[in-house]
Design a protein with these regions (language model features):
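N-terminal leader/targeting segments
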Residues: 3, 15, 112-116
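Contiguous, well-folded functional domains in the mature portion of proteins
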Residues: 34-425
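Bacterial Sec-dependent N-terminal signal peptides
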Residues: 2-5, 16-37
Length: 425
């Protein structure tokens, strides 16, 4: 099923160099000028890589050229040459998420961010025949070294900018405050004076636990939503530890490796095989959502690992000529095993061990634990587990064999953290 995810606006960072937008100056009042001595470090690093690697240069030029064939419109596909691509990523490293790609006047922020984000990965996710048969997640440039590593460099550079006070001001606050989807006017969040940077806004705290009541807090058979997020479904895990996928659902992962629960849980976990024959469910956070995640059940922390991996789109991007928009397909699980992520193993009294995996996505891909999350800690349902910084985000829960999980909300419906996600038997 096609899903447009604003949260992916994280990826916008890559998207945005010299693209002129339909936004007013107030939308991005402190737009940085290009340095007098040339490009910034992350852009210059890519230029150096391309100039020293003929294969990389050929692949990047081919991806850009194929993008022009698919969508020649300069307003929605502005980087149509290699030099224009350099300018584009230079701009993106200091751009606000809503000020990158031209959109019709009056377009809401959700769409502006969504399309800007998706655009960058449209180029990076274009299939290239030259990369067939290399056991990559797919045959696109974002998984090809050294471009893959450069994406991490770029993401960290943009994340550093979003941690500066240049990334937040009253004008930016006014932009998000007028959008009902962000919920700023609902009294959910801490005082806005606490936000000095964009990332402080993005990882905003609740004003009180009362604004996110926890369903059946003493009953561990009631699993609550770990975040404000849209439910994506429930999948069985076979006895060999692979996700069972319907061939007719979404875009299928080509290699069985990427459906491996052991790969998802991570190389350093003692519980890599603990979920064979079990169940997987995951929920997707949108960009406007509350980006702190909480324990969906009570228990004891057995492991808490951070797994450094790719800074990739998480799914597949296509251009829809009818709607003139970029579409992201990411419902089908498997891509989570390639993303930078966290994994907490929670030992519950009656339902075995449960794996909790916050999944970071491009571009900043920042997964963070709350200070209290340590091995041996006893935690309560609804207690804060951690937070994402700017970027796309997903949350996966794994249950062991013999534990029956029934999803309560309608598929793809939006839940608030603490609402009932499902029941265990």
């Amino acid at each position: 099923m096609k899903r447009h995810y604003l949260w992916m606006f994280a990826a916008i960072m890559i998207c945005g160099a010299t693209v002129l937008t339909s936004c007013s100056e107030d939308d991005n009042p402190s737009q940085p000028e290009q340095p007098e001595n040339g490009y910034s470090a992350s852009t210059q690093e890519l230029i150096t890589l391309v100039n020293s690697n003929a294969q990389l240069k050929s692949l990047l030029e081919k991806a850009i050229a194929k993008g022009v064939e698919i969508n020649p419109d300069r307003e929605t596909n502005p980087a149509q040459t290699l030099s224009e691509y350099y300018d584009f990523i230079e701009w993106a490293a200091h751009a606000m998420p809503w000020s990158v790609v031209t959109q019709p006047e009056g377009t809401d922020i959700f769409t502006r961010i969504d399309q800007s984000l998706n655009y960058f990965f449209f180029i990076n996710d274009i299939p290239l025949d030259e990369l067939d048969g290399q056991t990559l997640y797919n045959n696109s440039l974002q998984y090809f070294e050294p471009y893959r590593t450069w994406l991490k460099t770029f993401a960290k550079a943009w994340g550093a900018y979003l941690d500066t006070e240049d990334s937040w001001n009253q004008a930016y606050y006014d932009i998000v405050a007028k959008e009902d989807t962000f919920g700023i006017s609902k009294g959910w969040y801490e005082d806005a004076s606490n936000w000095k940077t964009f990332n402080q806004f993005f990882a905003r705290k609740l004003s009180s636990p009362a604004v996110r009541p926890i369903a059946s807090p003493e009953d561990n058979s009631v699993v609550v939503s770990p975040a404000d997020a849209c439910t994506q479904g429930v999948w069985q895990i076979d006895e060999d530890g692979y996700i069972v996928q319907d061939d007719e659902v979404g875009v299928q992962v080509k290699s069985k490796k990427f459906s491996s629960i052991a790969e998802l849980v991570g190389p350093n976990s003692q519980y890599r095989d603990a979920f064979n024959g079990g169940t997987l469910t995951h929920s997707f956070l949108n960009v406007y959502d509350y980006h702190r995640y909480h324990f969906p059940m009570a228990g004891k922390v057995k492991e808490a690992n951070l797994i450094e991996a790719d800074y990739a789109v998480g799914g597949t991007i296509t251009w829809n000529p009818k709607t003139k928009k970029y579409d992201l397909f990411c419902d089908t699980p498997g891509w989570q095993s390639i993303e930078t992520r966290g994994c907490v193993i929670l030992d519950t009294p009656d339902y075995g061990v449960v794996a909790l995996l916050p999944i970071g996505m491009m571009p900043v891909t920042s997964v963070n634990w709350a200070p209290e999350v340590k091995v041996g800690a006893e935690v309560t349902k609804g207690q804060e587990l951690g937070h994402f910084l700017f970027g796309g985000s997903d949350f996966v829960i794994l249950f062991q064999s013999g534990i029956s999980f029934t999803l309560k909300p309608q598929l793809f419906s939006h839940q608030l953290m603490g609402e009932e996600l499902g029941r265990l038997d």
